[in-house]
Amino acid sequence: SYTGTLLSTNKQFKNDYPLSLFPSLFLTYKLNDKSDMQVNYSRKINRPNFFQLIPNFDVTDPQNILVGNPDLIPEFTNLAEISYQNQLSKKTSFLATAYYKNTNNLITNYQYRDKNPDPNAKPDTVLIISYANANTSYTFGLELTTKTKLTKWWDFTVNINLFNSALNAGAITGGRDNSQFSMFGKVNNSFTLPKNFSIQLSGDYQAKTILPPNSRGSGG
């Protein structure tokens, strides 16, 4: 649990977090010398950070004022994955992962227009950004990764993540349910240089999604 007092108004706030368990399971089955299957399950927690909890107005940007929410509770995520890995050749490997990720009480931000907290400032109403717990969110998809050693000094990796995500935000005033198919792709080049030097060049593409970037994938 945590407690706090906002000195400007002498307002006190308190929130109790229940005791929770976070089991994990990891199984591997070797199909042959070059390939194997893996099954993974885990439960994780993401607690709101200090700045998300403080009910104090941050007017650094007068047009976009931030305020925390002391009523935020942790979000809990259940993640299940099944993976297939194959060493296609001495130089090339392939990994495919199907996954399902469910989050309860997802911490998200939202905007609303309200009275300016500074009575001497203009305009009288401003856009305020705060945080709230959505009901639930889920993501399921397929992630494909291949790594190839093109030369002794050049490693080439491609990652493609195809997924569908949905968000139930009915707990937030003005919130609504939403779902969308999306994708993420990344290419990475790793070069080994003389005298133990190395360099990496990478690029990625993120299609439009309704969830934060760190919520898109298989949880890795």
Language model features: what each stretch is:
Residues 1-4, 8-16, 28-30, 129-145, ...:
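Outer-membrane beta-barrel transmembrane domain signature of Gram-negative proteins
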Residues 1-103, 190, 194-202:
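Structural signature of Gram-negative outer-membrane beta-barrels, strongest in the C-terminal barrel
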Residues 2-11, 50-56, 63-65, 106-115, ...:
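Outer-membrane beta-barrel translocator domains and adjoining extracellular loop/strand segments
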Residues 23, 158-160, 183-189:
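One face of beta-strands
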Residues 69, 73, 95-155, 159, ...:
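Outer membrane beta-barrel strand-and-loop segments of large Gram-negative receptors
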Residues 99, 159-163, 202-206:
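Histidine- and/or cysteine-centered catalytic micro-motif in compact active-site loops
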Residues 167, 180-220:
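C-terminal beta-barrel architecture of Gram-negative outer-membrane proteins
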